[in-house]
UniProtKB/Swiss-Prot annotation:
Domain KH type-2 as annotated: residue spans: 43-118
Gene Ontology molecular function terms on file: rRNA binding; structural constituent of ribosome
Family stated for the protein in its record: Belongs to the universal ribosomal protein uS3 family.
Gene Ontology process terms (BP): translation
SUPFAM superfamilies assigned: Prokaryotic type KH domain (KH-domain type II) (SSF54814), Ribosomal protein S3 C-terminal domain (SSF54821)
Species assigned in the record: Phaseolus vulgaris
Subcellular location: Plastid, Chloroplast
Protein name per UniProt: Small ribosomal subunit protein uS3c
CDD domains: KH-II_30S_S3 (cd02412)
Keyword vocabulary terms for this entry: Chloroplast, Plastid, Ribonucleoprotein, Ribosomal protein, RNA-binding, rRNA-binding
Length: 216
């Protein structure tokens, strides 16, 4: 049996960089990791609860965290940043103060920056969210996968692979279905491959979605 390694961890230091950049003493390391998870979860929950999303796509590509002694810098890469900025001019400031209260950072300043992803559907997280939205609306999984591949081709990628696992279309026996278009060289370390795994809760149960995108 072939052993599958995570494509992002496999390429760290060559085409991939770390999502969290900070240094801590060994005794404080676990606290920092928990804080990072809390930040990421809070941002996702805030967007789900406070923003009306018609397409079902939140548009969060990735959240990068950089820490110094007196500062926490959070960079949110979004495909559709208007969702967070539109409506109220002080929305980001309100968002920042709410997060500061939640994290209880007494001696640290919190700074949030939002960066727009130029081609949203070139990012696997946004594509997986799109597929999840389609599956929730009971669109056929094949139709959802084909539409997702069309969107990535329009964004100008070299290859894409999509995999859905679970009780697809409500069938009693769980199975795995996948589709690939173009090249996805998982063995080539120099190849810039973006990857994500995403879970979606449907009326039939939980489905797992995996997306690999070969950009360059």
């Amino acid at each position: 049996m072939g052993q599958k390694i995570n494509p992002l961890g496999f390429r760290l230091g060559t085409t991939q960089s770390h999502d969290s950049i900070w240094f801590a003493q060994p005794t404080k390391y676990s606290e920092n990791i928990q804080e990072d998870k809390k930040i990421r979860d809070w941002i996702k929950n805030y967007i789900q609860k406070n923003i009306r999303i018609s397409s079902g796509v939140e548009g969060i590509g990735e959240i990068k965290i950089q820490k110094r002694i007196d500062l926490i810098q959070v960079i949110i890469y979004m495909g559709f940043p208007k969702l967070l900025i539109e409506g109220k001019p002080h929305k980001i400031e309100e968002f920042q103060t709410n997060m500061h209260k939640k994290l209880n950072c007494v001696n640290k300043k919190l700074n949030i920056a939002i960066v727009k992803i130029t081609n949203a559907y070139k990012h696997p997280n946004i594509l997986a969210e799109f597929i999840a939205g389609q599956l929730k609306n009971r669109v056929s999984f094949r139709k959802a996968m084909k539409k997702a591949i069309e969107l990535t081709e329009q964004a100008g990628t070299k290859g894409v692979q999509v995999q859905i696992a679970g009780r697809i279309d409500g069938k009693e026996i769980a199975r795995v279905e996948w589709i690939r278009e173009g090249r996805v060289p998982l063995q080539t370390i120099r190849a810039k491959i973006e990857y994500c795994c995403y879970t979606v809760r449907t009326i039939y149960g939980i489905l797992g979605i995996k997306v690999w995108i070969f950009s360059k």
